[in-house]
Regions:
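Negatively charged, low-complexity tracts enriched in Asp/Glu with abundant Ser/Thr
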Residues: 1-65
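Short, surface-exposed beta-strand/loop "edge" segments at domain boundaries and coil↔beta transitions
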Residues: 52-56, 68-69, 90-97
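Canonical SH2 domain fold
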Residues: 59-64, 69-75, 81-90
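Short, compact, well-ordered microdomains
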Residues: 79-130
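Polar low-complexity intrinsically disordered regions enriched in Ser/Thr and small residues
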Residues: 35-38, 46, 72, 103, ...
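Intrinsically disordered, low-complexity segments enriched in small/polar residues
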Residues: 30-33, 67, 98, 103
Length: 130
């Protein structure tokens, strides 16, 4: 990975930490698409994939702040703690504006078994998992 990509990733993580420090809410659309959930990210870690240096996993502890509109799940409520595993990866889509840049991925992250163990271990050590 080039130094420039490394620097740009750490810049993204600094921006993420700034949002946490300012308690900026994250919006996630309800699975039924008739509402949205607002979360505060309390803490996060990142973990580089061992066999893909252009991919970092993000493990977040989120607290639901509100539900706007309709929620497809009736038992969800303000104050619920949830964990999200997502990732950033360098785009390799030819001719895309994002080619060679970090892009956010949240759908079905694939992670090597040994990296999953390392990610969970780090999340426990840094008190992300409560």
């Amino acid at each position: 990975m080039t130094e420039n990509l490394n620097e740009s990733f750490f810049k993204l993580m600094k921006q993420k930490q700034d949002k946490i420090d300012r308690r900026i809410k994250t919006s996630i659309r309800d699975i039924g698409e008739a509402g949205e959930h607002k979360f505060i990210c309390e803490a996060f870690i990142y973990f580089q994939q061992s066999n893909s240096p252009e991919k970092y996993f993000i493990f977040e502890r989120l607290v639901r702040e509100s539900i706007i509109g309709f929620s497809s799940e009736k038992k969800l409520k303000k104050g619920d703690v949830e964990y999200r595993i997502s990732y950033y990866i360098v785009s390799r889509k030819p001719n895309a504006k994002t080619f060679g840049k970090w892009v956010f991925g949240q759908f079905c992250p694939m992670i090597p078994a040994e990296d999953f163990e390392g990610l969970i271990k780090k999340a426990r050590q840094e008190n992300i998992i409560i």
